[in-house]
């Protein structure tokens, strides 16, 4: 029974060291374009476009951050200006 404690300690110490090393390397970044980076080198993994972009998916897996594209509406769709009544 007394031999179990050293075995558990010998297993947990390297495991905790690896866990601490990995957790110190990870970064979570949120900027104006809602760029989420969660990686070892700081490269963005998930990019969420701003809310004013229309028709795009909420999250795009990418290895490089790109500028958001201008809003493009499908042909035939019309959005009235706010100062005009429909």
From Swiss-Prot:
Which coarse location class applies to the principal site listed for this UniProt protein? Answer: membrane
User: Phenotype upon knockout?
Assistant: Slightly increased growth and fresh weight.
GO annotation, biological process: response to bacterium; response to cold; response to ethylene; response to jasmonic acid; response to salicylic acid; response to salt stress; response to water deprivation
- Inducing or repressing factors: Induced by cold, drought and salt stress, but repressed by pathogenic bacteria Pseudomonas syringae pv. tomato (Pst) DC3000, jasmonate (MeJA), ethylene (ET) and salicylic acid (SA), mainly in shoots.
- Motif SxS motif essential for MIK2 binding covers 51-53
Which species is this UniProt entry from? Arabidopsis thaliana
Secretion signal, residue range per the UniProt entry:
1-31
List residues traversing the bilayer.
none
One Gene Ontology term of the molecular function aspect: LRR domain binding
May I have one GO cellular component term? plasma membrane
**Assembly and interactions?**
Interacts with MIK2 (via extracellular leucine-rich repeat domain); this interaction triggers the formation of complex between MIK2 and the BAK1/SERK3 and SERK4 coreceptors, and subsequent BAK1 activation by phosphorylation.
Q: Which family does it belong to?
A: Belongs to the serine rich endogenous peptide (SCOOP) phytocytokine family.
- Tissues in which the protein is found: Mostly expressed in leaves, and, to a lower extent, in roots, stems, siliques, seeds and flowers.
Biological role: Brassicaceae-specific phytocytokine (plant endogenous peptide released into the apoplast) perceived by MIK2 in a BAK1/SERK3 and SERK4 coreceptors-dependent manner, that modulates various physiological and antimicrobial processes including growth prevention and reactive oxygen species (ROS) response regulation. Prevents general growth and development.
Place the motif SCOOP motif on the sequence.
Answer: 45-58
Q: Which UniProt keywords apply?
A: Apoplast, Cell membrane, Cleavage on pair of basic residues, Membrane, Secreted, Signal
Q: What name does the UniProt record give this protein?
A: Secreted transmembrane peptide 6
Task: Respond yes or no to whether keyword Ligase is given for this record.
Answer: no
């Amino acid at each position: 029974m007394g031999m179990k404690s050293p075995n558990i300690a010998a297993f947990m110490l390297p495991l905790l060291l690896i866990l601490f090393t990995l957790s110190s390397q990870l970064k979570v970044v949120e900027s104006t374009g809602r760029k989420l980076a969660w990686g070892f080198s700081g490269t963005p993994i998930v990019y969420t476009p701003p809310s004013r972009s229309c028709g795009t998916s909420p999250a795009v897996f990418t290895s490089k951050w790109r500028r958001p594209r201008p809003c493009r509406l499908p042909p035939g769709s019309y959005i009235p200006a706010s100062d005009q009544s429909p």
